[in-house]
Amino acid sequence: MTKFIFVTGGVVSGLGKGITSASIGLLMKARGYKTTNIKIDPYINYDAGTMNPYQHGEVFVLDDGGEVDLDLGNYERFLDTNLTFEHNITTGKVYSTVIEKERRGEYLGATVQVIPHITDEIKRRIREIAKDYDIVVVEIGGTVGDIESMPFLEAARQMQLEEGRENVAFVHVTYVPKLKVVGEQKTKPTQHSVKELRSLGIQPDAIVARSEDPLEEEARKKISLFTNVPREAVVSAYDVEDTYEVPLLLEREGLGKYLIKRLKLEDREPDLREWEKMVAKYKALKETVEIAIVGKYVKLTDSYLSIKEALKHASVSNDVKVKIRWIEAEDIEEHGTKLLEGVDGIIVPGGFGARGAEGKIMTIKYARENDIPFLGICFGFQLTVVEFARNVLGMKGAHSTEIDPQTPYPVVDLMPEQRNLEKLGGTMRLGAYPVKIKKGTLAYRLYKKELVYERHRHRWEVNPDYIEAFEKAGLVFSGVAGDDERRMEILELPDKRYFIATQFHPEFKSRPMRPAPVFHGLVRAAKEYKQEKNATN
């Protein structure tokens, strides 16, 4: 019988419920149990696709084309698995289904209500995924007490009643602040948060107490007493240097063992050796390289979370720590490329719209002319084509029709199948598509195979009418779409140290033990470039 672990959050948002949920999933998987993670987002949006990265962070793209919350990226990285769009349950999806059923007459004239109809649909979606797994970790987004979360918490309460207490556990993530004035950790916010949860009929089985420093014994005892949670199940999750340390911290605190016992499962020795090795290696890195990320959402770095993580993975594989220099593309427009001086590598990531586009083009020109290791992603790939057209081929005013519909040289154009769409949500070229790689190229040396599947999220593409002109001028298109060879996927400049751009998002498939090849290559090239600079100085 499938076991369920619900993870809720209290006091404030942004405590790291996603990392806690991913860590619990890893601890269960490390014990040999078939485990998956589900994220519940209580917003009314159907998916994360049309959300502003400033508000919500990055939109993570799955193999099946699902545009989902960034927490699913953490789940995939921690559990080394590929999830589906169904693993992200939103209020929008739930209500859509219920309203469709009502319109079809499936409720036989009943008054459709939150209980039972909405809660039944939530439970149905969770159970549908659970069929194939021993353990399902379900993170309920938001904070206990939010009006949006109520139906989901009620559905979770009902599931414990229906599945049996030994099959459903609740983990509550809270915040324990330390007031500088008195110098002690305060448990009152946690007490109130649990009180709120209990008023909804849910008694947490374990409490993950987030704090700056390790939880003091006095605070632990107090939380246990006032929340009716055993002392061994009050877990100290203090701030660590890197999120990949969290599973090891929770395991040391005994959370994995406690949940296994609570769910009446056989406790097995967790195999975390590879994970421990990876964390130790990352922490021990001394040598550094600095890589600039020039984007339009850099004020909220979570907008580029998967890129940050992919650089971390490539740090471990190259024995060098990456320091990121965050640069707003508009600042390049205003202050020039001097903001890039001294960097060992440059990334121009994805993004939509005109704001900052010229700054990104200036950045690409700087990388190309100064032979600095460079990686362009999605919009960064398209703007690399624009920069090359303008500054190498002399096509004055060349642009993407996304930015300038009247450009004399539309070197990047809307894909034909995108031309008559009325809806924005879920209509891009989304998800994993095959990419054919040409032998004898940088891309082939990185991937070491001729066919790869990478995740996409775009409407525009390189205009096939200009490909011949680009290739004559020395630009190599080393990867094309497996389903349409006129669709360009990877470009490179062979005469440069490392200059590559991809139409797809390689960061979405990067994993701690298997870094994305183009990121591994970028960090390696940045390391070699820095060594060269140091040798000549």
Curated annotation (Swiss-Prot):
Domain of life: Archaea
Pfam family, one: CTP_synth_N
Entry annotation: catalytic residues: C378, H505, E507
EC number(s) on file: 6.3.4.2
GO molecular function, one term: identical protein binding
Catalyses which reaction(s): UTP + L-glutamine + ATP + H2O = CTP + L-glutamate + ADP + phosphate + 2 H(+); L-glutamine + H2O = L-glutamate + NH4(+); UTP + NH4(+) + ATP = CTP + ADP + phosphate + 2 H(+)
Activity-regulation annotation: Allosterically activated by GTP, when glutamine is the substrate; GTP has no effect on the reaction when ammonia is the substrate. The allosteric effector GTP functions by stabilizing the protein conformation that binds the tetrahedral intermediate(s) formed during glutamine hydrolysis. Inhibited by the product CTP, via allosteric rather than competitive inhibition.
Residues reported in the UniProt entry to bind UTP: S13, K186, T187, K188, P189, T190, Q191, K222
Top enzyme class: ligase
UniProt-annotated binding residues for CTP: S13, D146, I147, E148, K186, T187, K188, P189, T190, Q191, K222
Amino-acid positions noted as binding Mg(2+) in the UniProt annotation, renumbered to this chain: D71, E139
Protease among keywords: no
Region named Amidoligase domain: 1-265
Disulfide-bond pairs as recorded: none
Additional facts recorded: CTPSs have evolved a hybrid strategy for distinguishing between UTP and CTP. The overlapping regions of the product feedback inhibitory and substrate sites recognize a common feature in both compounds, the triphosphate moiety. To differentiate isosteric substrate and product pyrimidine rings, an additional pocket far from the expected kinase/ligase catalytic site, specifically recognizes the cytosine and ribose portions of the product inhibitor.
Oligomer and partners: Homotetramer.
This protein's name: CTP synthase
Originating organism: Pyrococcus horikoshii (strain ATCC 700860 / DSM 12428 / JCM 9974 / NBRC 100139 / OT-3)
Phylogenetic placement of the source organism: Archaea, Methanobacteriati, Methanobacteriota, Thermococci, Thermococcales
